[in-house]
């Protein structure tokens, strides 16, 4: 089982590469991370981007950390992205992603991605406009695979989200999305499945279960996001948390049964910005240890030696 951490917990706290790299290795005992663009904005001037990316890459190498991929983060998710109602908005998102791929390659990642965008209510409710947004999205992703390949990346990862105005948001839509991209992409397009999204009961119902996603998407899945959740919100809590109900060990068994043990899983906890730093550090540490034990199957001795 390949387990690592998304660097979302470092945002607005341990932003210096030399500091978070040391923390990940020494405090958390991990050597696999997913970088977030909340730490390095692709819109920054090229000189600043290059300088910061070089620091990130050097820090990761110094501390023996693999940056498996770079992900969009919270800031970019606030915008409508590649599904913006205005053509100029969609073009701006396209440019953002192209810059993001350059950043991903510069920090040493082999993949990049995230949620692709969200339709406005008006576009979503109009069948003709909804179909046009979908067609535009396919064109955009195909173009982005060319840019990602040129940057040196090996694949793009699209995150499935629990909103009907975003694409893709169901297993069947994910399957159709990938089918519609066949023969159009310069590099593979994979899916990232977040357990808190896939098990969101207000959208998918009380019987939502992970095997539906694992068996339905199979090798199309390029990564997982782990979080603790009550299944009523996209919670992104850690462990222990009395509100959380997610069984990490059970999920590990489901992943093994689906034959997806080699797919990396990243713990993604999103903390309130105002939460005390020492509280965040304690929480991310106990959460990582919980997942190392329950998901990765590490023994207490192995965790102490790491």
PLM regions with names:
Residues 41-50, 74-94, 118-132, 235-240, ...:
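Surface-exposed, active-site-proximal loop segments in enzymatic domains
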Residues 31-42:
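A short beta-strand-loop structural module common to alpha/beta enzyme folds
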Residues 34-35, 67-72, 109-116, 153-159, ...:
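Short beta-strand segments at enzyme active-site cores
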Residues 62, 80-190:
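Active-site acidic/histidine proton-transfer and metal-coordination neighborhood
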Residues 44-64:
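Aromatic-lined substrate-binding rim segments of carbohydrate-active enzymes
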Residues 1-7, 11-29, 54, 108, ...:
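Histidine-acidic metal/acid-base catalytic patches
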Residues 3, 66-68, 85:
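Mobile, glycine- and charge-enriched loop segments
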Residues 9-11, 37-39, 73-76, 116-120, ...:
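Active-site-proximal loop/turn and secondary-structure-junction residues that shape catalytic pockets
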């Amino acid at each position: 089982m390949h387990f690592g951490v998304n660097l979302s917990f470092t945002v607005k706290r341990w932003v210096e590469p030399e500091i978070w790299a040391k923390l990940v290795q020494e405090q958390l005992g991990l050597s696999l991370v997913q970088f977030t663009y909340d730490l390095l904005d692709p819109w920054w001037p090229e000189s600043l981007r290059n300088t910061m990316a070089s620091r990130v890459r050097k820090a990761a190498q110094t501390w023996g950390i693999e940056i498996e991929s770079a992900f969009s983060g919270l800031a970019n998710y606030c915008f409508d992205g590649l599904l913006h109602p205005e053509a100029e908005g969609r073009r701006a998102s396209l440019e953002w992603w192209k810059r993001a791929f350059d950043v991903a390659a510069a920090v040493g990642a082999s993949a990049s991605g995230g949620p692709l965008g969200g339709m406005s209510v008006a576009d979503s409710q109009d069948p003709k406009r909804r179909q046009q947004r979908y067609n535009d999205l396919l064109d955009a992703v195909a173009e982005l695979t060319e840019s990602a390949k040129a940057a040196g990346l090996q694949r793009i990862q699209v995150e499935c989200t629990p909103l009907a105005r975003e694409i893709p948001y169901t297993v069947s839509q994910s399957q159709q999305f990938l089918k519609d991209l066949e023969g159009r992409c310069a590099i593979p397009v994979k899916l990232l499945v977040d357990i808190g999204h896939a098990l969101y009961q207000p959208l998918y119902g009380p019987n939502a279960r992970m095997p539906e996603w694992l068996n339905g998407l199979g090798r199309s899945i390029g990564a997982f996001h782990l979080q603790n959740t009550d299944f009523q919100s996209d919670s992104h809590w850690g462990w222990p948390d009395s509100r959380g109900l997610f069984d990490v060990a059970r999920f590990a068994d489901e992943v093994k049964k689906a034959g997806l043990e080699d797919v990396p899983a990243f713990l993604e906890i999103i903390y309130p910005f105002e939460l005390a730093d020492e509280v965040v550090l304690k929480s991310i540490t106990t959460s990582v240890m919980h997942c190392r034990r329950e998901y990765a199957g590490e023994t207490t001795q192995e965790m102490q030696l790491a």
